[in-house]
Design a protein with these regions (language model features):
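Short, flexible loop segments at boundaries between secondary-structure elements
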Residues: 209-230
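Glycine-rich, highly charged phosphate/nucleotide-binding loops
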Residues: 48-65, 164-172
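A C-terminal functional module that forms or caps the active site or interfaces directly
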Residues: 183-204, 208-212
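Active-site rim beta-loop-alpha module in soluble metabolic enzymes
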Residues: 132-189, 197
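Short, structured coil segments at secondary-structure junctions
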Residues: 31, 90-93, 109, 135, ...
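Short, acidic/turn-prone active-site loops that include or flank metal/cofactor-
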Residues: 98-103, 118-122, 212-217
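Glycine/small-residue-rich loop that forms an oxyanion/phosphate-binding "nest" at active or ligand-binding sites
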Residues: 60-105, 109
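N-terminal glycine-rich anion-binding loop in soluble enzyme alpha/beta folds
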Residues: 1-54, 119-160, 251-252, 256-267
């Protein structure tokens, strides 16, 4: 089975991150599962609502192409899940958002969730996201690291000091959350999620830290397996009515007619 993993970072500027992510997903994927990791250019480089909207349009377009190219599942690898519902209504293959899958998983581990996100700009977006998923009462803290994707490059290239520095900053954001009642910590982004992936059983005080990269991959694998077993798919009523082919063609016509190029494939 083949999974298309859509990141919102630039494939050249964040090459160390995408290479590490691809290798990590390859190492934990179920037998017979291949994950293709793709970025975007221009990436989500000017954080804010307009950039989220622009990147979501490209992600939706890539998702439509991915299904036509025979992929079995799609992961929206951007924690804010911009375009998730639109993708789910455009595709018949399983579509998983890193944010949605991780928040629901974290909600099983504790009552009060603290989110550590990449930048303070995203803080309000995560509160809105939690409300959208019916988890608004469970998200008690959100704090931005004030980083950009390239700040992680040295750590993902093997610089131990850079990794330790990033982990210290992550802990600085998370520790006050735990002190004031959060009992689960969520890295609200695959960049910090991948950073903590090598820290087995990582905790801030008593609070487990949820690795969103592994949660998203195992979630899409589960839904692909359930679709094969039971034929289950999203509701095609009001929530995720399937877009007709003309609607998809009209959408694609609004964007440059270029298919995503293959960059990284994990066997």
């Amino acid at each position: 089975m083949r999974i298309f993993w859509q990141s919102f970072v630039d494939e050249e500027a964040s090459a160390p991150y995408l290479a590490r992510l691809s290798a990590y997903l390859s190492g934990i994927a179920a037998p017979g599962v291949t994950v293709d990791v793709r970025g975007l250019s221009p990436s989500d480089r000017d954080f804010g609502r307009l950039a989220e909207f622009r990147c979501s349009m490209r992600a939706i377009s890539n998702g439509i192409y991915a299904e036509r190219d025979g992929y079995d599942g799609f992961v929206l690898g951007h924690f804010q899940d911009s375009g998730l519902y639109e993708l789910r209504s455009a595709l018949t293959i399983p579509v998983v958002g890193v944010g949605e899958s991780t928040l629901f998983a974290a909600a099983q581990l504790g009552r009060r969730l603290g989110l550590v996100t990449l930048d303070p700009t995203f803080e309000i977006l995560h509160y809105e996201q939690a409300d959208r998923y019916g988890l608004g009462g469970r998200i008690t803290h959100v704090k931005g690291l004030s980083f950009i994707p390239q700040d992680f490059s040295a750590a993902f290239e093997g610089d131990a000091e850079a990794k330790a520095r990033l982990l210290r900053r992550f802990a600085e954001c998370a520790e006050p959350m735990v002190a004031s009642g959060a009992d689960v910590i969520v890295p609200a982004g695959v960049l910090p999620g991948l950073l903590v992936a090598s820290e087995r059983a990582y905790r801030i005080g008593y609070a487990p830290v949820v690795n969103c990269a592994s949660v998203a991959l195992k979630s899409v694998e589960m839904w692909m397996q359930l679709r094969a077993l039971d034929g289950i798919e999203p509701s095609r009523g009001p929530s995720f009515a399937l877009a007709p082919e003309r609607a998809k063609a009209d959408f694609q016509a609004t964007l440059a007619p270029t298919k995503p190029s293959a960059r990284r494939q994990t066997p």
